[in-house]
Amino acid sequence: MSTAPNKQSALKKITRGLTVGTVITGSTFFHGPPVLALGLTKLFKKSSKIDETNIQITNSWLGVNNWLIDHVLPNLKWDISIDEDLDLNMQGRYLMTCNHQSWVDTTVNQYFGLTRMPLTRFFTKWELIFIPFVGQAFKILGFPMMKRHTKEQIAKNPELKDRDMMEARKACEQLLSQPFTLLNYLEGTRFTQEKHD
């Protein structure tokens, strides 16, 4: 009995994984610093041109991710329907709702939205701010970043209940001066049968 096909398959998966990891890391280190640098300049001078440039850089960043999906994961099967009568454009303002099934949801929305509508921002956890470049880009690009508080924390400090709402309003006000797509996972967390029951 030969194990050659299994070794070849395992080697192919490892090579693909290394390729994806290398390209994503390289793209992050290429696109992340300019987004951060432009974001810092906004502290001193507000400018729609800075926002537009940051969006272009971010779309390029997402374009690299989409290239990976198309070329490194070519056997991927999509089962997605987009209403042909839906009139989307890059200058629009959209509110999108979605059931949060897995970490792939955001990738799929970014993949299909990249050339159809403005950059999709979504409500995200504050803890992601600590991911180098990515977390800071979320903040700079106007992604509403929510802190999760337990019932006990809110009971001790009732002001915490309204803090996320104020952060969401602030992020949404920042988006008003530009085209945007705001994605909200209404249940606020990934779906599991346990949470559903």
Which residue ranges define each predicted feature?
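Soluble catalytic domains of membrane acyltransferases
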Residues: V72-D197
